Amino acid sequence: MFFCSSMPLLAEALPLKNTQLGDPEFIKFHGLKLAYMTGSMANGIASENLVISSGNEGLLSSFGAAGLIPSVIEKAINNIQQALPDGPYAFNLIHSPSEDAIERAAVDLYLKYRVRTIEASAFLGLTPNIVRYRVAGLRRSKENQVEITNRVIAKISRIEVASKFMAPAPEAILNKLLNDKSITREQAQLAAAVPMADDITVEADSGGHTDNRPLVSLLPAIIALREKFQEQYGYSDTIRVGAAGGIGTPASALAAFMMGAAYVVTGSINQACVEAAASDHSKGLLAKAEMADVIMAPAAD
């Protein structure tokens, strides 16, 4: 360190540690070491091994449950919970507009085995399934506060979808769940005090379901939307907004944090890692791919 000997040293800025990046509330809420998450890749590509390895290092990883039959998801839940009894881990809940039974079966498993964190993706709006998962985990504490035991991280790429997850559960869906005896009357009442999601992942121009929005435009817009909903509903806890899509280097992760992201999520780059359930051939191609080698294509689902 060099400074002018004739001038007093008033302050010294030490290098930031990676544990200081992002929102400390995200780290505390999910029991992590870093404000870093690996997103779900369908058909189990985001594998049990990836989730467990990440969890052991204090990172939140979401199992790629989309496209898998219930028995395979159930086996993954058992294996991951055995390896990470205290977490952290998450499971994906993908919206299935043409096959409601698939979405419902996943929620049945998550409630049965007390999977406490889900990553909701590809939703166009709220469904009774995701509302049931969220609201069935609400209870009143001894201090008369609303306790949220079923956590939702909503991955979105459109403002109108983010709005639905930042608002409380719709009354019409709550009434339907009440009539079905899927939730209690107290849970329906408590639902008015909390948003549908604890965290909103802004999925910009990613390798998954995306609307190709640039992160530099979409992230600030969603953060501003969050401020509007916080003021409108007066939530006791702040909805956190993270960033995903195109975060493939330390520099791009730092840029997201500097724009105000509470956390960052990586996805496609993890498909090339040892723990991913992809073939060695696929991993080799991904490791060699450049930006110009990638183009948008229809999603398999």
Predicted regions and their residues:
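Glycine-rich beta-strand-to-loop/alpha-helix junction loops that act as flexible
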Residues: 240-248
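Intervening/peripheral non-core polypeptide segments
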Residues: 229, 249-252
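Short glycine- and Lys/Arg-enriched binding-loop motifs that mark or flank ligand-binding interfaces
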Residues: 35, 241-242, 263
